[in-house]
């Protein structure tokens, strides 16, 4: 890790690292890009306000935030706009759209066996050092991998080309500029990259870019988001009776020994107009979660608050955090405690959780050094606004020949969204659900230019596409599952998002 000394340039502007430090890093020939950061005081701004400005400036933008289970706000909020590249892949057709400084776009299309090779090339091209004073994300690829991305890591798994509103298997945008709220230091950090191959000229360009970003935040026009309006009732695709039939079929496969557990989901849809941004505002206030996100792009708008990490790779340590076993929150502290005790004694929930911890160990073990896979935390009750879950932590040290793309391949989709054994569970999901899952059960987050990864499981979210919103939730089916209870579990998991939509419709101050 490199020390990012601060230097003051014209007007007392705080900027780091120094030009001399950047020169030294460039001379190592190890890095292609060195992050440059400028600080502003944050007391005049909020992430929501800045997001309004960025959305007015660019249709392609994002906001990533976090809060712990104790509802303590996370240290950083990350925002980005005007990506210089978008990489999408659908049924092995890879598209790369680049945008230059003048706004001119160019698109290339090619067929690929696996999009991961292209992602590795891009990350190598922008290889960036980890800087001591910098936040964990200073630029990289931000977006989603859909549930159906599994077709690239498991080519023998046959997924039908069914409707799911033409969802892409992968949609990642390259952001060289990042705006970071450091809530602990009460600073806004503006970050862009300096190219090592043209250092002096690139440094001057970066300083100018940071000034443009500062002016945009200070003086930019705010987006007036159109309020969300439902044009029809939110309805589940599978009514209780149909979902019960699916559960019984899944239990048949369990009795036959095909699987131990499978997660069956139920999408809820409605026609809608307007934006999901106010829905995100409600979620971040009413359902603070480790992963809160808002995305806007050409074809989709997305808002959510996920409790569960899919995969996190930081300085060589790979982690996953399976959540399995659910109870609703109690209305009183006493009722909440009773529900917790019942959860910890429920043999069905404990068996399901143990299976998924084992699956997490297996997934991480695929690409970790022998003897490094550990269960760091086991059977802890994690509380959220509407539900509580049993949670564990599994870690491993990634092998030298593996990387962040391999981590996505190894773990996506999570066992908590598929089942065990995973391959056969995915086949049964394909048979019983009769539709592509799209983003549900996939991954949302970033792969950075330093080789790190932080992604959540795509749950507790709503997306809007082609004039329709969709919320999807699932339940883990085991041998003694009661169909009606599993249907209700789907409803419980969707409740926080449905209530956020209803509140957003009523209007926010």
Give the ranges of each region predicted by the language model.
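Short, Lys/Arg-enriched N-terminal segments with co-localized hydrophobic residues
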Residues: 1-14
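Extended alpha-helical targeting/anchoring segments
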Residues: 11-509
